[in-house]
Design a protein with these regions (language model features):
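Short acidic, Gly/Ser-rich segments with clustered Asp/Glu that frequently serve as metal-coordination loops
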Residues: 35-43
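Metal-dependent phosphoesterase core characteristic of DEDDh/y 3'-5' exonuclease domains
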Residues: 9-11, 23, 27-30, 42-48, ...
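Short glycine- and acidic-rich boundary segments immediately preceding or forming the N-terminal edge
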Residues: 1-24
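Conserved phosphate-coordination/catalytic loops
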Residues: 12, 85-92, 169-172
Length: 189
């Protein structure tokens, strides 16, 4: 059903979002990844990455020293500068730890397409060291089910993407906020 060219709220879409979140929570075998980056313009690189498990335990948390410029707008959001990251390891040094944390788990990310694009660019830059990346499970996006859960119509059809509620623009804070969001959806609240 459409009203003024906008798709109306669909209870089935909300129910599907709740079912997706419940499947995650009931399995307990997933992790949430979040990152902060150098900005939106290429090249884009990680400056901070965090992974939490279904119990909100921090599996990985760390900053990353990029080898490209950090956009001023990104710094205003997450606070990282080239100077503050000077002592951080480059991506290739933390990559084995990230693989271990993500291996054989469902990986959930808020706005997964963006983080996965940055991940894929980072892994490609590793050359042969990145060959195992193709073995990771696909990443699941929490933003899309949450948009359907909220049910706010988009002018382009479907549902309007929502900002991550309660995120603080740190990788760990946003990973925990995404986990809480999944738990909230699973409860149907």
């Amino acid at each position: 059903m459409r009203a003024h060219g906008l798709r109306s709220f669909n209870k089935e879409d909300r129910t599907s979002s709740i079912a997706w979140a419940r499947s995650l929570v009931e399995s307990g075998d997933f992790c949430v990844l979040d990152s902060e980056t150098t900005g939106l313009k290429n090249p884009v690189q990680f400056v901070e990455i965090a992974i939490v498990d279904a119990s909100a335990r921090t599996v990985f948390e760390g900053t990353v020293r990029p080898d490209c410029r950090i956009e001023s707008g990104a710094t205003r959001i997450h606070g990282h500068t080239t100077r503050s990251l000077a002592g951080s390891p480059p991506f290739w040094e933390i990559y084995p730890d990230l693989l271990e944390a993500l291996w054989e788990r469902r990986v959930v990310v808020y706005n997964a397409s963006y983080d996965r694009r940055v991940w894929d660019m980072a892994v490609r830059s590793l050359g042969a060291r990145g060959t195992l990346a193709g073995q990771l499970p696909s990443w699941e996006c929490a933003m899309r089910p949450y948009a359907a859960y909220v049910g706010e119509p988009s002018k382009r059809g479907g549902y309007r993407s929502q900002k991550l509620p309660a995120g603080d623009h740190s990788a760990l804070g946003d990973a925990l906020a995404t986990l809480r969001l999944i738990e909230e959806m699973a409860a149907g609240g």
